[in-house]
């Protein structure tokens, strides 16, 4: 169990306590529904729907994030396109085997969703284990950056594999870590468009990752 001084909070008024010895995957988003919800899948006898949520950064650019929620949640919130929403949930990953777009897709599984007039917000807190050696590199502008792949356990025993990046001194420190390192990070979920070279030309794709503002090695 982590010491009390490692217990953090995203927003107590939302009941979203960042108690790292109890919750290792929490997301808080405020943004705008960018398109009408579409049917996603059925699991455990429940229908799930998905929609894109646009969240504005301080820079003025936007992250477009995939939200997945139960049909009952969708009916209760009665949200329409362009609605302002608060989403509390968990970051999930799945492998895209359709052969189109990114291979690893991140979604936010909504545990709570409601209409809001709060400003845009994008925060995530994760505790997990490195499952791949860090990839340290330098950007064309000379900034140190390090790519990490974090395995975050669910209560069910399965794991989500979440790509993360960190910068500067944090990137240089993370570059020395090994597979099996346990760490905690806080940051935001971001979407990033890029071009993929294919046989018939360039294809625009979207990558999803966690940009870490704070990161700490736990074990």
Residue ranges, per PLM feature:
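OB-fold and OB-like single-stranded nucleic-acid-recognition modules
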Residues: 2-219
């Amino acid at each position: 169990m982590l010491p009390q001084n490692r217990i953090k909070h995203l927003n107590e008024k939302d009941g979203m306590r960042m108690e790292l010895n109890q919750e290792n995957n929490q997301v808080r988003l405020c943004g705008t529904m960018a398109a009408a919800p579409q049917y996603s899948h059925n699991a455990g006898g429940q229908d799930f729907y998905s929609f894109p949520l646009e969240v504005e950064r301080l820079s003025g650019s936007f992250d477009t994030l995939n939200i997945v929620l139960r049909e009952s949640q969708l009916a209760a919130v009665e949200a329409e396109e362009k609605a302002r929403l608060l989403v509390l949930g968990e970051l999930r990953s799945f492998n895209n085997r359709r052969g189109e777009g990114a291979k690893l897709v991140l979604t936010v599984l909504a545990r709570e969703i409601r209409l809001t007039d709060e400003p845009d917000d994008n925060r995530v807190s994760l505790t997990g284990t490195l499952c791949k050696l860090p990839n340290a590199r330098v950007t064309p502008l000379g900034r140190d950056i390090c790519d990490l792949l974090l395995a975050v356990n669910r209560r069910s025993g399965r794991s989500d594999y979440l790509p993360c990046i960190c910068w500067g001194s944090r990137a240089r420190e993370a570059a020395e870590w090994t597979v099996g390192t346990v760490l905690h990070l806080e940051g935001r979920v971001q979407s990033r468009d890029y071009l993929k070279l294919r046989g018939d030309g360039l294809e625009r794709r979207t990558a999803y990752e966690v940009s870490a503002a704070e990161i700490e090695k736990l074990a």
